[in-house]
Amino acid sequence: MEIAVSFLKSKYDLDDTLKEIDNTSANYIHVDLMDGEFVKEKTNSLEIIASLKKCRKPLEVHLMMNDSSLLEILPSIYDLKPKYIIIHAEIKDPKFFISDIKEHGISVGIAINPDTLVSSISDYIKNVDEVLVMSVYPGLGGQKFIEKTTTKLASLKELPKEKNFIIAVDGGINNETISKVSGLADRVISGSYVCLSDDFENRIESLR
């Protein structure tokens, strides 16, 4: 199982946090960018993007943004050449953005919020490389894992093998909740559990 580390909450400043993650065994740096419209919270996305240019690890960029914000930010994201860009199923036109991201040679993921059904992405699922199940409500770090989201992971796992995407889960992942998603998720995203600790690598290893 792959580990991606989110840095929404950290005991260090942005640059030092990214350096710490870069020096761990994490598979990806998970980048949460928010527009203050799709979710209430807003990140200083351009500052974050500038800092990410120094990172060595592959990037997975999770865009909690509406359609107009996506159109504005995506050119800057493309310049980063991330491995994955994840958009939300709840926006107006996921199909357009899935196509646009793939045209730039970047793997695309689609995220579903805790109250969004797996069936709602049936029209897109054959065209994505990752399905990200949110196990907390998007926007804030440090929330508790929502147990009911494991049923979505199980439903995705049962889909025909020709559906060629990885299953990821994001939110409330720690050494106690990891067992609930083990065997169901191919990738887990952990944030506060890692970045508020004194030893990032130790926390990452506890999830494997």
Q: What does each of the following model-derived ranges do?
A:
Residues 3-7, 29-31, 59-63, 83-87, ...:
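Hydrophobic faces of well-ordered beta-strands that scaffold small-molecule active sites
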Residues 6, 162-169, 174-178, 182-208:
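Alpha/beta catalytic cores of nucleotide-metabolism and tRNA/nucleoside-modifying enzymes
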Residues 16-21, 69-79, 116-127, 171-188:
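Catalytic cores of alpha/beta
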Residues 21, 32, 77, 131, ...:
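Conserved, mostly hydrophobic/aromatic
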Residues 30-100:
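N-terminal active-site wall of soluble small-molecule enzyme domains
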Residues 36-41, 114, 122-154, 158-160, ...:
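Glycine/Thr-rich beta-alpha phosphate-binding loop at enzyme active sites
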Residues 43-62, 100-113, 149-171, 207:
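Alpha-helix-loop-beta-strand connector modules within alpha/beta enzyme cores
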Residues 85-93, 132-142, 184-204:
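Glycine-rich phosphate-binding active-site loops on the catalytic face of alpha/beta enzymes
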